[in-house]
Amino acid sequence: MSIVKIIEVVCEGKSIEDALNNGVREAAKTVKNIKQIDVKWVHAKVEHEKIVGYRVNAKVSFVIEH
């Protein structure tokens, strides 16, 4: 039987995909076996009427080894 643990992260990037990749990369520094990331919300940062970046809140799921 596998045990899955979930942590919540907030990550930023120039695109949503970039933000998520940054979040996975940072989470992978402290946890192994990341299997899934679930997005809770996305915020766009706006400056001078243009979107200049994204902030994403996501849950990162990973398998705990015995």
Residue ranges and their predicted role:
Residues 2-36:
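Short, well-ordered alpha-helical segments
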Residues 38, 43-66:
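A cross-kingdom feature marking charged/low-complexity
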Residues 1-2, 60:
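Short N-terminal signal/transit or membrane-insertion segments
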